[in-house]
Amino acid sequence: GTLTARTLAAAIGRSHEDGLAPLDYHLDLIYDLLARVLKQSGKHDPLPFEPALWADLDLMLTDAFVLLSAHLAAGRVNPETLHSDWKIKPGSVDLSTALDQAASSGDIDTALGRLRPVHQGYTDLRDALARLRELKAAGGWPTVAARQTLHPGDHGPAVGDLRFRLLASGDADLTGRIDDLLYFDSRLAAAVKRFQ
């Protein structure tokens, strides 16, 4: 019904949390069809909606679920198209079973969650993406106004900008004593290496 359609549309909308583009999964068309179905369902006609409209919505939802599931399970880009000698093979996933389970339980989020990679690297990437989006929403990265390449031993406002920028990315810290925030010391050099 429309509750499941809205639940799937919301899950597609959150696919950006996995680094995916929600519009790649027909989100705009799904919302358009869903609005038309809901509008027709509100009428008091003996036949309150067109079956073809429901069929279109069902097809779009099914295709979106299967495509999103495939991308969550195996990635959006086939690595063999980038590197012909790629050795890592993704695990096989039965997308029709995933669709059946999601449809029968109505728990779209759990069904999609089971398809995500379970290794820590994937979780770390999702967390980093969330932090970057928060940083962007807050105005973005602090800029480093350096006119030339900075080196250990340099001193000046650009060094302070660099230190602040590396603090924002989590690559530098202010624990311990720093005598001069504008001095490019060994701790800042180590932070630059971590960042790189």
PLM segments and residue spans:
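Auxiliary tRNA-acceptor-end handling modules of aminoacyl-tRNA synthetases
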Residues: 1-195
